UniProtKB/Swiss-Prot annotation:
GO biological process: aggrephagy; autophagosome assembly; autophagy; microautophagy; mitophagy; otolith mineralization completed early in development; piecemeal microautophagy of the nucleus; protein processing
Name this protein carries in UniProt: Cysteine protease ATG4B
Matches recorded under InterPro entries: ATG4_LIR (IPR046793), Papain-like_cys_pep_sf (IPR038765), Peptidase_C54 (IPR005078), Peptidase_C54_cat (IPR046792)
E.C. numbers: 3.4.22.-
Organism: Bos taurus (Bovine)
């Protein structure tokens, strides 16, 4: 059966392959497990991640648009999953676990409501699709990892409850000074609309070099998304070690990407296989609920997750990290610096203190798709025209 036409009712969970009996550790978003002694703990961790899949019969996007995202929304759903993990870490903590038919904290309900399939949910398929129009994507068009990262960054501005600082690193470069400035800023962190068009260049929505007067503002929790291309047609095997190490970091949010025909949300690895949640299941939309509890069983994957060889991964991906505090960010920087010492491993991105003079401010390049730079970046990172195929209905 084609993955695009699977429905929740036709799934048989016994058909999903269980974890292999191996002495190799299983890593799930910064947590290490033994499949020989902790299989239940592994599955509980996986089931606690929010699982967003294709849905049908939701209110029409834009009032007259699609009522289902089957066949085109897989990367949007993966973007929802990686961002939902950031909100779970922000409001519930990495060690929170979901239990079926058990009342959850109100903050869990608020996180879930932010992703429901309705126009007034901050990170709904409706909001992502309509915000994507401003990025040059028509509703129903397939997204690549970079585009969905840019859209989520813009939507996060409206999520005042979470108050996240979202940084999308470009040109394979993470600039520490830019991130510290962003996380210490109380100004809008996406879009230059808050400033006059003829003002100085802006980084992440505030003037370059602007630190603000007086005492430093409190650190805002950071969501760091890094679009990458790890090869031309295939992933360069030299990146495998550093990619796997990303899942071992406690700040890990996982990876969005996939392989020809589909996009997945990768949450860990075992041996040379990546572990992922698959959005290619069509479920009925959950009726909008303004109060807790939200019917939530279909938002949690209650069967063993998928696995695929790293060699099968499409080279166009986006890696995510969450740093609740500045100490978390400093620790992440130290870990990344140590990656360069791994024998035979190729760094996936560069970590620098200051913006290199030959690079433009990364967020300026994404304020408008009229910019030739933005178009260049989208062609480089979003390989939907060549490496991905839209699933046929």
């Amino acid at each position: 059966m084609d993955a695009a036409t699977l429905t929740y009712d036709t799934l048989r969970f016994a058909e999903f392959e269980d974890f292999p009996e191996t002495s190799e550790p299983v890593w799930i978003l910064g947590r290490k497990y033994s499949v020989l002694t902790e299989k239940d703990e592994i599955l509980a961790d996986v089931a606690s991640r929010l699982w967003f899949t294709y849905r049908k019969n939701f209110p029409a996007i834009g009032g007259t648009g699609p009522t289902s995202d089957t066949g085109w929304g897989c990367m949007l759903r993966c973007g929802q999953m990686i961002f939902a993990q950031a909100l779970v870490c922000r409001h519930l903590g990495r060690d929170w676990r979901w239990t079926q038919r058990k009342r959850q904290p109100d903050s869990y309900c608020s996180v879930l409501q932010a992703f429901l399939d309705r126009k007034d949910s901050c990170y709904s398929i409706h909001q992502i699709a309509q915000m994507g129009v401003g990025e040059g994507k028509s509703i129903g068009q397939w997204y690549g990892p970079n585009t969905v990262a840019q859209v989520l960054k813009k939507l996060a501005v409206f999520d005042t409850w979470s108050a996240l600082a979202v940084h999308v690193a470009m040109d394979n470069t993470v600039v520490m000074a830019d991130i510290r400035r962003l996380c210490r800023s109380s100004l809008p962190c996406a879009g230059a609309e808050a400033f006059p068009a003829d003002s100085e260049r802006h980084c992440n929505g505030f003037p370059a070099g602007a630190e603000g007067g007086g005492r430093a503002a409190p650190w805002r929790p950071l969501v760091l998304l890094i679009p990458l291309r790890l090869g031309l047609a295939d992933v360069n095997a030299a990146y495998a070690g550093t990619l796997k190490h990303c899942f071992r970091m406690p700040q890990s949010l996982g990876v969005i990407g996939g392989k020809p025909n589909s996009a997945h949300y990768f949450i860990g690895y075992v041996g040379e296989e990546l572990i992922y949640l698959d959005p290619h299941t069509t479920q009925p939309a959950v009726a909008a609920a303004d109060r807790c509890p939200v019917p939530d069983e279909s938002f949690h994957c209650q069967h063993p997750p998928g696995r695929m060889s790293i060699a099968e991964l499409d080279p166009s991906i986006a890696v995510g990290f969450f740093c609740e505090t500045e100490d978390d960010f400093n620790d992440w920087c130290q870990q990344v610096s140590k990656l360069s010492l791994l024998g035979g491993a190729l760094p996936m991105f560069e970590l620098v203190e200051q913006q290199p003079s030959h690079l433009a401010c990364p967020d300026v390049l994404n304020l408008s798709l009229d910019s030739s730079d933005a178009e260049r970046l989208e062609r480089f990172f979003d390989s939907e025209d060549e490496d991905f195929e839209i699933l046929s209905l």
